[in-house]
């Protein structure tokens, strides 16, 4: 993730697309009963700020909001992830904390869930 996103003292949230789910039958007790999602960060494209470009890596994140495959979501990482409800004692580094309805960048809607994708 960008170095600016790793500042101390603040809670950073990121956008990601849900690409699938992860099933682990043997796992830490703190993950028992939790849905795991495979998410790919989405970045505003520097060459065309009206579009997203996918990040290079995927991340396994605990789902706290009932997100589904293909949805654009908000996720948080690190100590901020453990601030999500019922995550304080769970061994998590990334948690999906919201499902995105719209994204506006530079005065232009670049994502609208109603049209299922980029505006």
Regions found by a protein language model. Name each.
Residues 51-59:
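Short, structured beta-strand/loop micro-motifs enriched in basic residues and often containing a Trp
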